[in-house]
Amino acid sequence: MRTRLHRLVLAGVATASTLLPVAAVGSATPPAPTAAAHGSLGENFMWGVAASGFQSEGHAPDSNWERYIQNNPDWDRYRNSIDFRSRYPNDIALAAGLGVKVFRIGIEWARLQPTPDTWDENGFAFYDSVIDTILENGMQPMLTLDHWVYPGWALDRGGWNNPGMVQDWLTNMRKVVDRYASRNPVWVTVNEPVAYIMHEVRQNDTVADHMLDEVAQAHNEIYDYIHQVQRGALVTSNVGYVAGAENKVNGPLMERIGGKLDFIGVDYYFGYEPPSNSVSQPDGSAATPKGMWELPVRPEGIYYALQHYSEKFPGKPLWVVENGMPTEDGKPRADGYTRSDHLRDTVYWLQRAKADGMNVVGYNYWSLTDNYEWSSYTPRFGLFTVDAKSDPNLKRTPTDAVDSYRRIVAANGVPSTYVPVRLPSECGLVDPPASCDDPVTVP
């Protein structure tokens, strides 16, 4: 399993999940549609939006990612991203205007601890104000402790190759928990650990298996600490779901941390695309997509992702911590599928999952605004689009999905008469073998 994990990480499964080969699965014709209810998600459903620290804040201190960008001259320069650091009151107000209950942000370790022996009170004061503004706008903060970014001095020590990294990490994270537990946040310890490992393998020659063990230890220890400090806390580490290979990719992680998750946090974006379906290279191999916007969007796949974890953790709450759809620089997609289409279709499948007995409790849209997608500003995920490359004013322009999400939140779902714009794909293109063993249909 360790050797397999290393190979998977090196292959980049977490961000190019649809290109990962799995055992051959026939693309069986789905059975005739049968009636299926998709009732309201309920008044207690936790609608939210999501962002991360480094991707949005700008004015970045020295960190591993600042250096990775410097080491890759072909990447977009970071500059000040979309400047959430200066514009957070307006962005938080935009989120509140959607009617959502949760605003997810990251707390950047690099901003809080510039050297091993010093803490920056100005960094803490910034997050004090952000979190208080979220609360003042009637939303609950969801705080991510580690969204792949750590101080430059920690990289100098070897990053996650350093045997002392877990203790350095815990020293900071305990301070963060002590400071903000009284605000009653929801906690995400480590964002998408397998994708995190993938980036560290590529950029810092990190040993994948070692980092998996270290990240799991960090999660488990801070989970216990949060529960000591904050009564009734909700703590998770969200997985980046990999259609067609979830057990192989995230299984080793869940074996290590599954006993210390108060809810299962799932990030779902893309379906499975067998390489043989897109042959275009002279040697007969599949072409690598130019960008995320070319990866297969299968909204019904979120049903199988939730089903997967509902079966593995019966009765455990399920929260979609991230979900969205990329476009290329905000341009209309070649297939004509809009952000509103994708959002409504996805919510339809959330309602189907809930109606079928899955304990779905929350959904965060990724993301409130466009941001820096770990090397590029070209992939756009935002409800509000921002042209970080050419607009010096960084204007937030609402997409068609803003009004759609506002209506969805107000109604706690799509209408009972709603029919998805994008009907289910052939089962072998969604999440095999599950999507072929028991395919869902639209009545």
Regions found by a protein language model. Name each.
Residues M1-P30:
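Secretory targeting and sorting signals
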Residues S81-E108, F263, K312:
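Catalytic domains of carbohydrate-active enzymes, especially glycoside hydrolases
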Residues P73-R87, N161-P163:
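Active-site mouth loops of central-metabolism enzymes
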Residues R79, T115-N122, W160-G164:
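Short coil/turn segments at secondary-structure boundaries
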Residues L98-A125:
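Aromatic-lined carbohydrate-binding/catalytic grooves of carbohydrate-active enzymes
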Residues R77, F84, P116, G158, ...:
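Generic anion/oxyanion-binding catalytic loop in active/binding sites
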Residues P33-Y68, N72, A125-A334, L343-V442:
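Active-site region of glycoside hydrolase catalytic domains
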